[in-house]
Regions:
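Acidic, surface-exposed loops and disordered segments
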Residues: 1-173
């Protein structure tokens, strides 16, 4: 059984090299909106989506992420947009909620010809004093916890073939 949506899921790949070309605002808005339709525990909508296109904040968040990673490379692979997903840490499902938001946006981006890669370490960033300072600067509650981020932009190269699916990935009982 195959249809366009199933094909979309099966052809999405992580992109780790981006063109410098900006993402049109209509495309960015469409990707962001799909995140707001992700399922959340109890329908409580615990996540907050932060789209970073400002070069100053793009550099700052990359620096903070690289510090956590112990590297001096760009953890967002040169993508022109970084989308952070944080969520209310008091929600028992904040990680699951934010993860669903990230996946919705990654699939939407692929549908629009954009590339993404999920980037970790946002929890460490926003649990730190530097991260809390950013939240204060952005006038966001300090109860927000990092879930993850996606780098977003036009892929600089064609996506490769998927790895073979592992044996016993699915077990029917």
């Amino acid at each position: 059984m195959e249809n366009n949506f199933l094909s979309l899921i099966k052809t999405r790949r992580s992109v780790r090299a981006y063109k410098s070309e900006p993402v049109p605002s209509e495309a960015l808005d469409a990707v962001l909106e799909t995140g707001t339709y992700a399922p959340t525990g109890g329908g409580h909508q615990s996540p907050t989506i932060i789209a970073i296109t400002d070069p100053k904040y793009r550099r700052e968040i990359a620096k903070l992420n690289a510090e956590v990673m112990g590297s001096n490379t760009d953890p967002y692979y040169g993508a022109p947009v970084v989308i952070l997903v944080l969520a209310d840490g008091s929600a028992s499902t904040f990680v699951e909620d934010g993860s669903c938001v990230l996946e919705n946006m990654m699939l939407a981006a692929h549908a629009l010809g954009l590339g993404t890669v999920w980037v970790h370490r946002e929890r460490e960033i926003f649990d730190s004093e530097s991260g809390k300072a950013l939240l204060r600067e952005w006038k966001l509650p300090e109860t927000l916890r990092g879930v993850g981020a996606i780098a977003l932009g036009y892929p600089a190269q064609e996506a490769g073939q998927p790895a073979a699916r592992k044996q016993n990935y699915i077990v029917r009982i």
